[in-house]
Amino acid sequence: MQLRDLAPRSPNVAAPPYNGLPPPHLLLGYQAMHRALNDYLFDNRVFMQIGYDSPPQRPRRLFWTCLTDCSYAVNVGQYMRFLDLDNFHGTFTQMHNAVLMDRVAADMGRAHLRGRGIDVGRHGQVLPQLDAEHHSLLSGNGAGGLQEGVLMRTASAADAELLAAIRQLRVALCHYLFCYAYDLFQTEERYRFLPGSDVFLEPNWLSYFAEAFAELDTQQLVRDAERKFRGRRDVEEPTETMARCFMSTLASDAVSLAGTGLSGGAITLCSRRVTDRTGLRPRDRHGRAITASEARRIRPRAVRAFVDRLPRVTRRRRRPPSPAPPPEEIEEAAMEVEEPEEEEEELLDEVIRTALEAIGALQDELSGAARRHELFRFANDFYRMLLTARDAGLMGESFLRKWVLYFFLAEHIASTLYYLYSHFIANREFRRYVDVLTLQVLVVGWDVNAQQVFKRIWSEQSNPATIFETLWERILRDFLMMVERTGQFEGMDDADQQLFLSDIQYRDRSGDIEEVLKQLNLSEELIDSIDISFRIKFKGIVAIATNEEIKANLRRVLRHRREDIEAAARRGQPL
């Protein structure tokens, strides 16, 4: 009954014992909890252990409690079998490149997936039809598909527009860096953005930049690079280069790029220098090459122009302007002449810094709730681990399979946790009346014979405000360690096992210790499907009516009930 419209004189309260009046108590937030869980892609939803609690406190309050268990199944076997198909040509290198390229291309795609149960967003926008079978496979559209779909569903219209602009600029920067690394400036539209071109002196160059590079086909760029440098052993695999480019766009600023292998025009993405490019360096209309200091002076205007092109309703706050260049730098700029390769490296650095600063400015415009989605990011950690393992020669077929498995599990869990977080934590109205006491994620793997292969549980009962991010950090650390330590269980002594459990911050009731350790040597081919379950215990306020008419109706109902019991007792009949 608490899930229905209980307004006075509504059809739901017309009959006795309500008599046209709301009930004397309301479970605040209970309906919102049901609606949020029903609107997501869960296959099964169980609401249990509904009860009441009145702890000894002043003033005395009555609370409702409820434990929910919502789950869905992911078809792991179909994707894992896909990895063995002939399109990988039976070689590990091609298998690695195909998987990596599939993930990077998907992350930069524009797929929008939604959960079952809702066709219209909260602001009235029509959501696309869900391909339930596609979503239930472990071969969905990657971190940029499922996660972006969840993010767009929970965002306001203004935030959605900002997020789309951020994504467009990140994709454009990724494609630009890749084109620069492999000299893929074949078209006039791309060629005008070579470092040193006069387009970088225009205040709106970021908008033109996004239009020129955001819509390029990621996989086609990789194929073009492979054809151009086929047989060159001194050039890095284009798939790994694209992964490094993508990682660079996730950096918070230009300083953070060092860990991605990207740092300025000396770009370590392939083993060649910019001077390999045929032809002369681009020049402005007066025949003079643009210098880095000139591009640096235009940066604040370019960033603000890119942000200001969005509708006014999206703009909330202003970033402090970038510091103006010192006077001596301005004087030096007037005397600058064209310099060799180092100058072009500085120009490329300036392009990266300007794009990242614009992304940061757009993120500052997001609402607090939308900015919090960064807490559930995971792709960068997985890409970095894959590239590091490849460089160190530590990666085998088992490592790659485990990487794929845990990447997709992380995608599903992170996306769902963010959805739940946005409804139950970031939603201030909900948190005003309801707390999350316990959060638990349960993952169970099954083989083709429906026999359990492994089982893992992560549980948190910490501060309700941080319970989701705390649990996600543990799960992500666990997944990364499982991939990194692939196949190491057999050689572990007791001390190594305890060190591993400490590294993943293993806790009691997080699955049997032997099962946790066996996961390190688990053969992914045995897994056919995985059930992912999210268990949440809620505690909400019970509102007690003070309206005299409602209280009088309650007393009348209780009196009639008591009279019926007494009459039945006199007749010797059970009520």
UniProtKB/Swiss-Prot annotation:
Molecular function terms from GO: double-stranded DNA binding; single-stranded DNA binding
InterPro entries from the UniProt entry: Adeno_preterminal (IPR003391)
Region Disordered, residue ranges: 314-340
Biased composition range(s): Acidic residues: 328-340
Protein's cellular compartments: Host nucleus matrix
Sequence motif Nuclear localization signal, location on chain: 309-318
UniProt keyword annotations, A-Z: Covalent protein-DNA linkage, DNA replication, DNA-binding, Host nucleus, Phosphoprotein, Viral DNA replication
Pfam families documented for this protein: Adeno_terminal
Marked site (Priming of strand displacement replication by covalently linking the first nucleotide of the new DNA chain) residue numbers: S510
Residue positions where O-(5'-phospho-DNA)-serine is found in the record: S510
Modifications the protein undergoes after translation, according to the UniProt entry: Preterminal protein is used to replicate viral genome, upon genomic encapsidation it is processed first into iTP and finally into TP by adenovirus protease.
Site (Cleavage): R116, G117, G265, A266
GO CC field: host cell nuclear matrix
Listed GO biological process terms: DNA replication; viral DNA strand displacement replication
Protein function: Protein covalently bound to the viral DNA that acts as a primer for viral genomic replication by DNA strand displacement. Assembles on the viral origin of replication in an initiation complex with viral polymerase, DBP, host NFIA and host POU2F1/OCT1. The terminal protein stimulates the template activity over 20 fold compared to protein-free templates. Neo-synthesized viral genomes are linked to two preterminal proteins, one for each 5' end.
HAMAP family: ADV_TERM (MF_04061)
Record family assignment: Belongs to the adenoviridae terminal protein family.
Oligomer status and interactors: Heterodimer with the polymerase; this heterodimer binds to bp 9 to 18 of the genome. Interacts with host POU2F1; POU2F1 binds to the auxiliary sequences in the inverted terminal repeats and tethers the pTP-POL heterodimer to the origin DNA thereby participating in the assembly of the pre-initiation complex (POL-TP-DBP-NFIA-POU2F1).
Protein's name according to its UniProt entry: Preterminal protein
UniProt organism field: Fowl adenovirus A serotype 1 (strain CELO / Phelps) (FAdV-1)
